[in-house]
């Protein structure tokens, strides 16, 4: 739980500070390996950078790279703070007398920091590439134009379907749990359910009694069933459309 809380706390902060990260990245790349006065300064200071990026690239550009930034913060700070929290809760940072040991505390912090940085480094690179992308007139540093899959590739459809499969499972599992229970509940002589009055009642009872996690019971099995089903459905649908449009042009 320490890992989860630490990661979520860092993500919450990242939502508000990511625009500053975009500005910082652009300013750090400006004039890379060039002597002062030999290059055009697109960003004179922090405030000018905010205005310039918002005006030329659009306000949405100030949140560029937000997805990898959130993942980076969740992994790095979740591992860093979570590991340190576990060490503290386990009593590894204190002496036999109960006082804080500075050496152990520093060692635990360093180890947690190294682990977080090592795992977060690839994501930080992706974040930097995205945040550096800008319109030609205010571009600084090397401009990456990543394209993992070629257009119209079956891999694009497969990757998109995998992501949408996760979204479908997250959205539908509570209703799947409730429908399973509604169909399985005992009934009286008139066929009326003895445990739930209907869909809403089943949702409320499950949430009150079993909590939010009760609404997601069997989510792993749901994904292994619904995930491949969604993936294959969208994949075949995309391929059939490509074949159809190819031969009807």
Curated annotation (Swiss-Prot):
Its main location: mitochondrion. The chain crosses the membrane at residues 38-58, 59-79, 154-174, 226-249. Keywords: Membrane, Mitochondrion, Mitochondrion inner membrane, Repeat, Transmembrane, Transmembrane helix, Transport. InterPro entries: Mito_Carrier_Antiporter, Mitochondrial_sb/sol_carrier, Mt_carrier_dom_sf. Signal peptide: none annotated. Solcar repeats lie at residues 1-90, 152-243. It holds the Pfam family Mito_carr. GO terms for cellular component: mitochondrial inner membrane. It is found in: Mitochondrion inner membrane. Gene3D superfamilies: Mitochondrial carrier domain. It catalyses: a dicarboxylate(in) + sulfate(out) = a dicarboxylate(out) + sulfate(in). It is a multi-pass membrane protein. PANTHER family: RE38146P, SOLUTE CARRIER FAMILY 25 MEMBER 35. Belongs to the mitochondrial carrier (TC 2.A.29) family. Putative antiporter that exchanges dicarboxylates and sulfur oxoanions across the inner membrane of mitochondria. This is Solute carrier family 25 member 35. It comes from Bos taurus. The gene is SLC25A35.
């Amino acid at each position: 739980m320490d890992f989860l809380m630490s990661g979520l706390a860092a993500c919450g902060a990242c939502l508000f500070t990511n625009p500053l990260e975009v500005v910082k990245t652009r300013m750090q790349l400006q004039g890379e390996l060039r002597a002062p006065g030999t290059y055009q300064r697109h960003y004179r200071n922090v405030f000018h950078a905010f205005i310039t990026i918002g005006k030329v690239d659009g306000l949405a550009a100030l949140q560029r790279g937000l997805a990898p930034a959130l993942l980076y913060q969740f992994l790095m700070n979740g591992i860093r703070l979570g590991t340190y929290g576990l060490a503290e809760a386990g009593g590894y940072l204190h002496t036999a007398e109960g006082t804080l040991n500075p050496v152990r505390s520093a060692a635990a912090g360093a180890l947690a920091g190294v682990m977080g940085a090592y795992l977060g480094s690839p994501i930080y690179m992706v974040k930097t590439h995205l945040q550096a992308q800008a319109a030609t007139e205010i571009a600084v540093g090397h401009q990456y134009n990543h394209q993992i899959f070629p257009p119209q590739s079956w891999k694009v459809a497969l990757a998109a379907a995998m992501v949408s499969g996760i979204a479908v499972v997250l959205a539908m599992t509570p209703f799947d749990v409730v429908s399973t229970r509604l169909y399985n509940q005992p009934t009286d002589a008139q066929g009326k359910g003895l445990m739930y009055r209907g869909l809403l009642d089943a949702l409320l009872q499950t949430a009150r009694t079993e909590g939010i996690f009760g609404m997601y019971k069997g989510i792993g099995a749901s994904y292994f069933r619904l995930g491949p089903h969604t993936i294959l459905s969208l994949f075949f649908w995309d391929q059939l459309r490509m074949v159809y449009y190819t031969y009807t042009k």
